């Protein structure tokens, strides 16, 4: 999250990547958030070029049309976020792309009756410095928990 009001996020992409060309041309993109069972497919898609490979077909992904942008998202991903580019900032090896979040697609099994999303149930993965890590733990705390007063028992 870059900003909550309005909702925004950022990604970094190397300018020589095919996905970068698509983003620059359309000024739209989708952030698909895969679960750990998709790690091998995610790695394959990160290594192989879409210029020479039909990665969607090869990985057997099911594509669904987005609601607010002219793109598709991967139905197998428990979370997908539709974005509209606001700004692109060249940094060096990567360009920082800041985007408005237009809408999201979230597996309903991850939401409770109040609409809260339980990301720990999604078994999402994180990529950091060339390694894939599971995100399976519960939250370590929510904003302000260090100073929040404890509720008194009745």
Feature names for model-found ranges:
Residues 1-154:
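Basic, polyanion-binding surface patches
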């Amino acid at each position: 999250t870059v900003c909550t009001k309005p909702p925004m996020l950022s990604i970094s992409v190397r300018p020589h990547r095919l996905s970068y060309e698509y983003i620059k041309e359309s000024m739209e993109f989708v952030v698909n958030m895969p679960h750990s069972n998709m790690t091998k497919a995610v790695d394959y898609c990160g290594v192989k070029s879409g210029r020479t490979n039909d990665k969607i077909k090869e990985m057997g992904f099911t594509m669904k049309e987005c609601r607010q942008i002219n793109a598709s998202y991967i139905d197998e991903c428990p979370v997908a976020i539709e974005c509209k580019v606001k700004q692109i900032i060249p940094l060096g090896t990567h360009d920082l792309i800041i985007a408005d979040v237009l809408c999201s697609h979230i597996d309903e099994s991850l939401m409770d009756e109040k609409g809260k999303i339980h990301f720990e149930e999604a078994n999402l993965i994180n990529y950091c410095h060339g390694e894939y890590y599971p995100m399976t733990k519960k939250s370590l705390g929510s904003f302000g928990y260090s100073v929040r007063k404890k509720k008194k028992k009745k």
